[in-house]
């Protein structure tokens, strides 16, 4: 919820934060636009015209924006746990009738009850690695029930090379990531911490920041990272008939599962 009366002010603030978010994310994802293009291309190739798309852990709406721009008949429902990101998304896209944003917490086994399916496509980008393995497994089974017949699930994320059996690949990938980040941050792009600091200090979102701090209070530590093979096996077990990688740059993949 915005803390100002003028929605135009909130929209301008949200647009600026969204731009800074996108720049910050590109520092971590060198070919983010290609990742997004792959996702939108696969939706267009696999689903019918005018697809209904669910964006998991949508953040401030960047992937949803790419989808509706690439697919004029598409509509996107974005779900996220974070009230600050949702507030920014709702303000940034308040005039976009083909996008809506819903609060949902994947740690809650009943999260999908807040979502009216089915969907032609379910997507996510740089988000699901935050989930604990048991939550991710349950989520993939939920997605298999939410997506319609011949529907598609697409997840763009970094799937790390194994440091023991793929040591060289992991080393050169980390060197590449460091080089890209150093260049971006050196030219003034927000760091991850810097973006959040700027967003939380924005008066427009004071209420959302308070809510965010309550939600994330006591939540510390990163989830163990599952290898890409494990992701694909879970999706097979969940009932998807075809699974595989449809795009890759080093450890950055778009994995695809067709129902």
Model-inferred region functions:
Residues 123:
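A conserved beta-strand element that flanks and buttresses the S-adenosyl-L-methionine
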Residues 1-47, 62-66, 154-191:
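Conserved class I S-adenosyl-L-methionine
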